């Protein structure tokens, strides 16, 4: 394999995959580095794509030639158009997806894309050309050096990642996977501001232990649409043997569930100050909801299948960082889940780097077509300036000045 590339993308999550594909399709020679080739495009949290606001973004990515829409359509097990009570501009497509098929489809599409090479390794250092004061490549955990004109960081939760379950803290980027070290320390040394954000995930449940008769069924749309303008990928619209959609189910918490959860608040890292990061605004944890909306006697939960051929269930709306015994005890007081068995518990996973890095100078940042930054993607091109492009896709050279995001 060549040791020099136009672009190196570090991290093969959804953002990294889109960045690599976009650059490769524009003629750049790309190296995609990931810690594990078997987890390319892993759906780390809920097995779904789109929804309010996010669905519009996926369709915009599709219009720009991205792959997310086609992959989502090909791996969908249910389609729903949300917000239909509002005007068409507010309609939000959402798919429930087969977790394994989603990742496999992404990998297949990347492998069929010219100009992309793959390498399984960690990156411990960004290399700098001191004469031009620009990125010149990366050094991997195995001691290899790859040269590049530009580097995109799409590390997700892996940069100095930490997992919290009750009073336990585990170093890791994802459950069962190690965190990545070296890049954060280097960026801090250069003067970048580092912070933490947090994301949580609910428990995965054995679907065979659920009493669905005590829940409400939620079918997909009778006339399903697609994310992509290329509708050939949808299993529901194929002319030969179209598939039936898999239903989701709805249940609710109750005061008894809330009281059980409260017994673990004294051991919750969120309430004890061990987690300082900001959480997603529209996806609060179950303990957040109980605290902030204490007047409510119940909160809606969605029982979502993880794929066509698995009994694993994702309990949407029940993310938390409480101890395992509190989780299970509360879970079994929810209608339909009285005999529920967990495959693995929920946890809170702070990221090692925040999504806003303020420019410390007024100098501009030169970006070209090869430098693509998507959600949770960080572009590092100049040194010692401190650029960060939260969501940028630029065709052609342009000079811009980055400023901090504000709500």
Where are these regions (language model features)?
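Gly/Gly-Pro-rich "capping" loops immediately C-terminal to redox-active cysteine motifs
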Residues: 339-365
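Beta1/beta-strand and adjacent pyrophosphate-binding region of the FAD-binding site
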Residues: 2-15
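Conserved N-terminal/central alpha/beta ligand/cofactor-binding core
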Residues: 21-127, 142, 154-171, 178, ...
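Conserved FAD/dinucleotide-binding core of flavoprotein oxidoreductases
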Residues: 222-275, 297-338
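Flexible coil segments in periplasmic/lumen-exposed cytochrome c-class electron-transfer proteins
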Residues: 364-407
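Core beta-strand elements of the Rossmann-like FAD/NAD(P) dinucleotide-binding domain
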Residues: 3-5, 141-150
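Conserved beta-strand-loop-beta-strand element in the redox core of flavoprotein oxidoreductases
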Residues: 127-145
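Terminal amphipathic helices with adjacent charged low-complexity linkers/tails
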Residues: 200-215, 285, 291-298, 310
């Amino acid at each position: 394999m060549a040791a020099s590339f136009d672009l190196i993308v570090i991290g093969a999550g959804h953002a990294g995959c889109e960045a690599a594909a976009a650059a490769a399709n524009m003629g750049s020679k790309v190296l995609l580095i990931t810690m594990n080739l078997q987890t390319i495009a892993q759906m780390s949290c809920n097995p779904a794509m789109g929804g309010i606001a996010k669905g519009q973004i996926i369709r915009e990515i599709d219009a720009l030639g991205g792959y997310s829409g086609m992959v989502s359509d090909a791996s969908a097990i249910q389609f729903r158009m949300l917000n239909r009570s509002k005007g068409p501009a507010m309609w939000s497509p959402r798919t429930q997806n087969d977790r394994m098929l989603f990742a496999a489809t992404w990998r297949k599409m990347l492998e069929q894309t010219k100009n992309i090479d793959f390498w399984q390794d960690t990156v411990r250092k960004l290399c700098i050309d001191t004469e031009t004061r620009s990125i010149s490549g990366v050094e991997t955990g195995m001691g290899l050096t790859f040269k590049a004109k530009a580097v995109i960081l799409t590390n997700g939760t892996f940069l100095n990642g930490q997992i919290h379950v009750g009073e336990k803290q585990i170093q890791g980027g994802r459950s069962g996977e190690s965190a990545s070290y070296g890049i954060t320390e280097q960026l801090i040394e250069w003067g970048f501001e580092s912070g933490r954000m947090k994301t949580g995930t609910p428990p995965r449940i054995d679907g065979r232990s659920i009493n669905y008769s005590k829940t409400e069924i939620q079918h997909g749309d009778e006339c399903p649409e697609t994310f992509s303008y290329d509708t050939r990928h949808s299993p529901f619209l194929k002319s030969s043997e179209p598939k039936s959609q898999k239903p989701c189910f709805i249940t609710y918490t109750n005061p008894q569930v809330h009281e059980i959860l409260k017994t673990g608040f004294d051991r919750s890292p969120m309430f004890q100050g061990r987690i300082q990061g900001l959480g997603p605004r529209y996806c609060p944890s179950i303990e957040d909801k109980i605290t902030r909306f204490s007047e409510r006697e119940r909160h809606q939960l969605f029982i979502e299948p993880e794929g066509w051929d698995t009994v694993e269930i994702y309990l949407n709306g029940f993310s938390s960082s409480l101890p395992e015994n509190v989780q299970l005890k509360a879970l079994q007081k929810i209608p339909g889940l009285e005999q529920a068995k967990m495959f693995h518990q929920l946890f809170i996973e702070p990221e090692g780097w925040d999504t806003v890095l303020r420019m410390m100078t007024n100098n501009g940042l030169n970006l070209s077509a090869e430098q693509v930054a998507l959600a949770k993607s960080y572009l590092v091109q100049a040194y010692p300036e401190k650029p960060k492009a939260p969501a940028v896709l630029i065709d052609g050279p342009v000079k811009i000045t980055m400023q901090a995001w504000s709500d």
